[in-house]
Regions:
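Short strand-connecting beta-turns/loops that link adjacent beta-strands
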Residues: 35-36, 74, 100-102
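Short histidine-centered beta-strand/loop micro-motifs
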Residues: 30, 42, 49-54, 71, ...
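A short, N-terminal "cap"/entry segment at the start of jelly-roll beta-barrel domains
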Residues: 1-42, 49, 122-144
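Short acidic-glycine-tyrosine-enriched beta hairpin
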Residues: 73-89
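Surface-exposed, flexible loop/turn segments at secondary-structure boundaries
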Residues: 49, 67, 75, 93, ...
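Ligand-binding loop in jelly-roll beta-barrel domains
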Residues: 89-119
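Short, conserved beta-strand element in jelly-roll/cupin
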Residues: 43-45, 53-69, 109-112
Length: 144
């Protein structure tokens, strides 16, 4: 990742690089990765069971597709492209893709940076042994 004080990204180009299929729940591409915050683009391939993050707050913008988003004890809420959800650390949440819809792609910011192992499933059996994330090959920031 380029350590400049600023970067420009072509999100459409990054989205086009996501594979059609993946064994992991998501495939992501880091846009920034600093102690104070990290930002990523990720595509959802399989349901993400209810889980939490102990070390970071999360800010998610759904760029494409539709998902059913479960949070805390509320019934799942349908999110559509252009909608955003934010929540603090230790809030249980899960994401279910909508069958037959466009692939769900999110822009996310974690504050502070989420440690790689900070994904704690409420019921580990629900993950069915599926890996949480696969990283897209490093994306080089390009200045405009």
């Amino acid at each position: 990742m380029d350590e400049k004080a600023y970067n420009f990204f072509d999100l459409a180009e990054i989205k086009a690089r996501f594979p059609d299929r993946a064994e992991s729940m998501i495939v992501d591409a880091y846009l920034s990765d600093h102690e104070s915050a990290s930002s990523r683009l990720f595509r959802l391939y399989h349901p993400i069971p209810r889980h939490l993050h102990e070390t970071c707050d999360e800010h998610l913008v759904l760029l494409d597709g539709e998902v059913d988003f479960a949070i805390a004890d509320e019934p799942p809420r349908r999110l559509r492209a252009g909608q955003m959800v934010t929540f603090l650390r230790n809030i249980v949440h899960g994401i279910q893709p909508v069958e037959g819809g466009a692939p769900a792609v999110f822009f996310t910011v974690d504050t502070p940076r989420r440690a790689p192992g900070d994904v704690h499933f409420v019921d580990s059996a629900e993950s069915k042994g599926r890996r949480f994330v696969t990283h897209l090959a490093s994306y080089e920031a390009r200045s405009a």
